[in-house]
């Protein structure tokens, strides 16, 4: 989607957009829920040392193993679910057209929410729904829905709407595992649901603002 000279700018802007939103969240919470005098916190830090090659290798292996396990569990499961919903209708009959499938019906219900952002196609909204399981599954879902023909992405996005899509994907709820962690740390389902709602609302508002500015600039 993006010209070669702009790809680095796109990636860096996404990186800083995430940082900026994190800072804004912190400032808002500091002025509202956590306002008051800060509690003194003292912690003795150990001496810093250059890590050994063994410890670095072990850390890399653990991170790689975690990703592989996720790829062969959550992402694989999401792909299977998408394939099933894509090929059957409400009566569990095999469909000849994806537009008649359960997946199309589910995506079509949600699609109007994303139309103001520039990507109201049901396939895009479906990919974002599966992203709740793992953000990586957004890509695999689009691949399945497009039959592996990534050239068809040009029919769903322009370079600008693709950027808006990346903004939304960056900012909305990370994954089921993150939600479960929030639920465990916060202690209630209500608190976790509230955080998910705030994250999704933030993603929509920021993406809508970016899209609006782009439209005014003729992008």
Where are these regions (language model features)?
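Alpha-helical membrane-inserting segments
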Residues: 21-29, 33, 81, 85, ...
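Transmembrane helix-loop junctions at the membrane interface of multipass transporters and ion channels
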Residues: 1-11, 177-188, 209-219
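Flexible glycine/proline-rich, aromatic-decorated loop/lid segments
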Residues: 1-3, 29-42
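Alpha-helical transmembrane segments and their helix-start/interface "positive-inside/aromatic belt" motifs
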Residues: 11-14, 65-75, 186-197
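Extended, low-charge hydrophobic alpha-helical regions
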Residues: 79-200, 209
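Alpha-helical transmembrane segments
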Residues: 7-25
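Core transmembrane alpha-helical segments of multi-pass membrane transporters/permeases
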Residues: 40, 56-87, 124
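Juxtamembrane inter-helical linkers in multi-pass membrane proteins
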Residues: 35-59
């Amino acid at each position: 989607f993006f010209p070669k000279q702009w790809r680095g700018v796109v990636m860096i802007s996404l990186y800083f957009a995430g940082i900026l939103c994190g800072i804004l969240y912190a400032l808002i919470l500091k002025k509202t829920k956590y306002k008051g005098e800060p509690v003194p916190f003292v912690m003795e830090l150990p001496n810093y040392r250059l890590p050994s090659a063994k410890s670095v290798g072990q850390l890399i292996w653990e991170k790689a193993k975690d990703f592989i396990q996720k790829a062969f569990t959550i992402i694989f499961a999401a792909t299977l679910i998408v394939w099933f919903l894509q090929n059957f209708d409400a009566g569990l009959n095999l469909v000849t057209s994806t537009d008649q499938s359960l997946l199309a019906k589910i995506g079509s219900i949600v699609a109007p929410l994303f139309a103001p952002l520039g990507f109201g196609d049901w396939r895009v909204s479906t990919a974002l729904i599966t992203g709740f399981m793992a953000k990586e599954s957004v890509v695999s879902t689009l691949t399945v829905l497009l039959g592996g023909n990534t050239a068809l992405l040009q029919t769903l996005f322009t370079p600008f709407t693709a950027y808006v899509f990346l903004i939304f994907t960056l900012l909305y709820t990370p994954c089921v595992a993150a939600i479960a962690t929030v639920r465990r740390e916060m202690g209630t389902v209500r608190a976790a649901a509230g955080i998910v709602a705030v994250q999704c609302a933030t993603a929509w508002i920021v993406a809508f603002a970016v899209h609006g500015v782009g439209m005014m600039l003729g992008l």
